[in-house]
Amino acid sequence: MNPADQQSIERFVRTTLGCKCPDEVFESIVLERVPAPDAALPCTRLVIGNRLLIYIHETQPAKATKEAVSKLTTQGRTERDAKHYNRYRLVVASDYPTELLSAARTGFDSVAGTDQKAHLHVLATDQLPDALRSGDTNLSR
């Protein structure tokens, strides 16, 4: 991963997602494409400082159902707990984020409930840094 990608990812995580992690957490960034609970739900997996787990799922409203978000939320929370990460963030990105916000929130809340260490972010696709949309695999810092 080049320094520009590292900086854009850190800026995205801090500014867009609101992460307040200390600087040293960003010394380790692992980025990879991973299979999701089924082939229709691919996502990018991002681990920051072995503390923060982020799944990024790009979709369009017709495909963004509460069931899809529920599956990704379950998978992410399970991984967070198994690997002892502090937080899990699910980013659902679409060209039409307002059209899927309600279904995404319903699917997320049905699984995460009051889990204060799990967060949903529904964003416009153009808010994602290029490094998170590239599809490159096994990129590490």
PLM segments and residue spans:
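Generic surface-pattern signal
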Residues: 14-18, 22, 31, 74, ...
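Conserved beta-strand termini and adjacent loop/short-helix elements that scaffold enzyme active sites
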Residues: 57, 93, 121-125
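Long, charge-dense
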Residues: 107-141
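N-terminal, charge-rich interaction modules
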Residues: 1-52
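Generic detector of short, locally flexible boundary/turn motifs and exposed helical patches
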Residues: 17-22, 51-59, 84-88, 130
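Acidic/glycine-enriched edge-of-secondary-structure segments
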Residues: 27-28, 48-70
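Amphipathic protein-protein interaction modules
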Residues: 59-112
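A short, terminal or domain-edge coil/loop segment
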Residues: 4-12, 35-44, 78-91, 136-141
